Amino acid sequence: MTNEHSAPLTYRDAGVDIDAGDALVDRIKPLAARTMRPGVLAGIGGFGALFEVPKKYREPVLVSGTDGVGTKLRLAFDWNRHDTVGIDLVAMSVNDILVQGAEPLFFLDYFACGKLSVDTAAAVVGGIARGCELAGCALIGGETAEMPGMYPDGEYDLAGFAVGAVEKTAIIDGKSIQPGDVVLGLASSGAHSNGYSLVRKILERAGARPDQDFHGQPLVDVVMAPTRIYVKQVLAALAEHGTAIKGLAHITGGGLLDNVPRILQQGLSAKLYRDGWQMPQLFQWLQQQGAVADTEMYRVFNCGIGMVLVVAADQADAISATLRAQGEAVSRLGEIVPQQDGMAQTFVV
């Protein structure tokens, strides 16, 4: 006769379902297969993934980036919207390495949860695969960690890792930026993946519901719109205009005010004009509902601009035309000026 202290235990008894993990892998494989590109020698299923750097690079420099989705995940849990946060995950890393001129080559993800829901995880990974397709990189591997007791049921965390390559002579570092250069902005799709702690606080104050109407769309669709991936459009502009594109800034945490200075040398400032772009309705509503000051908006949110380019003044119109031909909404935000005493490196007038 056995009792509860002598009965054989299994991993499932401890909260880890190996069969569910295997079922997820089976769901993931065809999703990853859609992202395959030249260079992949071995992908999902092995102990390590293999990728051959394309031979078109004479002096390739590898560029890597890692990021998560932040507290936007809290809304994904609360509003049961899991199919787009994977796109966010890819976008945050590939847009980051793009600013140095890198072509994203491959991507890996880390999915951690307390109890694995195959359907939820497959929805997330489906978004990751879609993001990789948009970025032209291969989903080459990843890790799913089921850790009982570490996360509440229905919740998970994500991390992503992107690796790209750029020709050594084509690295974009902002060192050639000078007074008179023009600042261009590419439209965002919404709040992207930053500022969501404040977004959630404002939603709570406003008593907002995911299904309420917001200018003809459910609020959930507007708030959870996935981060735009700028890779193919910007790479096309770089291929055509080369060194005339002097600097790129991905507008993430810190908004316009903290991210544009990251590509500027000492002694330079970016002067942006508030009438240079239209702030989307979402940000107008967030500012009104939260009584958020203008400066706070610019240092928390992208305010409608997801990527900034600093370009040679005599090429600004041509570069804008190339980007518009790629489907981008381009705004002329301002220009680079000498930094005066007490002047911020980025300011809006």
Curated annotation (Swiss-Prot):
Keyword Nucleotide-binding part of the UniProt annotation: yes
Localization (cell): Cytoplasm
Keywords of the record: ATP-binding, Cytoplasm, Ligase, Nucleotide-binding, Purine biosynthesis
Annotated CDD domains: PurM
GO MF terms, alphabetically ordered: ATP binding; phosphoribosylamine-glycine ligase activity; phosphoribosylformylglycinamidine cyclo-ligase activity
HAMAP family the UniProt entry points to: AIRS (MF_00741)
Official protein name in the record: Phosphoribosylformylglycinamidine cyclo-ligase
Family of the protein in this entry: Belongs to the AIR synthase family.
Organism of origin: Bordetella avium (strain 197N)
Pathway membership: Purine metabolism; IMP biosynthesis via de novo pathway; 5-amino-1-(5-phospho-D-ribosyl)imidazole from N(2)-formyl-N(1)-(5-phospho-D-ribosyl)glycinamide: step 2/2
Enzymatic class: ligase
GO biological process terms, semicolon-separated: 'de novo' IMP biosynthetic process; adenine biosynthetic process
Gene encoding the protein: purM
Pfam family of the protein (one): AIRS_C
Reaction equation(s) it catalyzes: 2-formamido-N(1)-(5-O-phospho-beta-D-ribosyl)acetamidine + ATP = 5-amino-1-(5-phospho-beta-D-ribosyl)imidazole + ADP + phosphate + H(+)
Disulfide pattern: none
Entry EC number(s): 6.3.3.1
GO cellular component: cytosol
